[in-house]
Amino acid sequence: MEKLLAQLIRLYLMPGQATGQHPAATPLVSDDGLTRAIVIDFPRAAGDESGHWAQLCEVANTLQEKLGFPAPAVSVTGADAFRLWLSLREPVPVADVRRFLSLLRSAWFPELPLHASSTVELPPCLHGATGKWAAFIHPGMGASFAGEEGLDIAPPAAAQLAFLEGLESIAPAQFEEALAAMHRPRETAPPQAPLAAPPDGLLLKDATLEDIVRHLHAMGIEPSFRHVLPGRA
């Protein structure tokens, strides 16, 4: 767990920020209003089990395709939502994060709220109300969690670590350029060059179980997904 905590500190927590003993007590914003994380919730809507996953994929793909950001982390909350985790290499004022999300909504997602959390439960942790586990997940598995965004049993620490070790943070210049690009009038923005092939981090389609097992085996990890599927009648 120490290695996993080190990755959470590397990617998302402010210097000197204590994680505490209770997962619900982890702040992402320092006392002077700075943050290194943009964590966006995508809650499940009533009567729509998969729409929030599609929304997360659209936002994640746009951030990478249009703004050139590195691949984000994805988690389930143990309740009824997915989370998208963006890491900033250097702290920025919370006001800049709000401005970034406001510009992102205006540019591509006017129908989505896209609010950043200031306090968050650090996966893996047990959700007190549901008894399900919050956990980081392989992006290709997201659709399989739609409608039941949690794990029945604690996830393997090695797999959680593997999902974070290869992630990169958004550089200060990337963040500033993204703000500038979204602030420019749409008609004067430079055209985006077409991508020859989707980068590895994109969430354009769901990976098969075999893809995920192969990915974890390549890292020397024996997978144990620990998600109990409901029995068939």
Q: Which functions belong to the PLM regions below?
A:
Residues 29-48, 90-227:
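DNA replication initiation modules
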Residues 83-86, 132:
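Short, solvent-exposed polar/charged micro-motifs at secondary-structure junctions
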Residues 1-80, 87-103, 203-210, 224-228, ...:
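Signature for HUH/AEP ssDNA processing cores
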